[in-house]
Amino acid sequence: MSKAELKRLGDYIREVNVRNRDLKVTNLLGLSVSKEFMPSIANTIGTDMSAYKIVERNQLVYIADTSRRGDKIAIGLLDKYDNAIVSQAYTVFEVVDHEQLLPEYLMMWFRRPEFDRYARFHSHGSAREIFDWDELCDVQLPIPSTTRQREIVAEYETLTNRIRLNNQMIQHLEATAQALYRKTFVDNIDKENLPLFDIAEITYGFPFNSELFCDDNTLSPIIRIRDILSNKTETFTSEQVDKKYEINDGDILIGMDGAFHMTIWSGGLALQNQRIVKIVPKKGKYVSAYQIFYSIYDTIKQLESSIEGTTVAHLSDKDMKKLSIIAAPAKIQEESYSLFKTINKSVITCKKEIIKLTELQSLLLAKMGQKKATER
């Protein structure tokens, strides 16, 4: 798309600086690099809240300081609340005329990774790097007719809604699995504890050479601790390792440093990086991944909490060998295994659909920079 077809953003937006002088607005929000508003965790005891800025629905906010944010800029559109207050360090702005530019369309542009890179490149400073208001105003973007903007936004929101519905289904299925676990293995049965190592294969990750990590998706995907909760990765390697370091759908993964993230993997075949432990139920034991997951979950989180605040938490082989699984009589064990397997299959299906939908969102955002996508 030629520069002649792009518009200067500063001609369509203006800064807003309304303070909470009468203290009527109490909903204090923060802003994340995932470009979402979230309840603030700041300690506001003794803080003068009248100096905080008010944000109204369909206004936008960004944090000019781009330092230490992982090459991303924190920016968001307030669309879930009528109003809120944010730190006076944040910049609040709005679209001047919604008949020329839709806030939702603009927010889609801000979600593009190209915009993150642009903001980082145009940030200046020594101790802190700042993407200032003038730089934001100089952003060039395509602004099609509002009819076309609404069509693009509608496509994106359709994908967003499907992701939300899948997440709701996952929550429902996991709640069902947890209830089944409590009924089968906790309430009103004669049970015994079996060492985790007796009923599952435990594998610790391989120390891959990080210098070989890249974004070439024709190579082998590699899972690091930060990828556990998202069930996907954007990191790949050419390094070849033993098959025991392969991760498959249904394997339990636990991060061994910092927060002990846990998941039942659903992101497809991948490789297991160091400081991740993989747990796979042994065949013929009628023990499901869900049974293991819920048996050890509370213990893992208690261990994490006991270490937090003193040092960086580390999960050791010694810790793993202390874990045990609650086992029911053989018949109950076998019946529950089938139910857990069905639930797990449904959860994996939902998670895979979320990954595909997210990829479609990324594709739609990428097409915004192409002339054909904005014409109609």
Task: Give, region by region, the residue ranges found by the protein language model.
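Sequence-specific dsDNA recognition surfaces
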Residues: 5-62, 197-212, 218-251
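Generic alpha-helical structural context detector
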Residues: 10-14, 63, 91, 107-111, ...
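Short, positively charged
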Residues: 12, 103-135, 287-323, 376
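A short glycine-rich beta-alpha junction/loop motif
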Residues: 84-89, 124-153, 270-277, 309-337
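Alpha-helix initiation and N-capping motif
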Residues: 6, 103, 177-178, 193, ...
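A short beta-sheet element
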Residues: 57, 61-111, 243-300
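Non-catalytic DNA-recognition/assembly elements of restriction-modification systems
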Residues: 1-20, 138-207, 326, 330-376
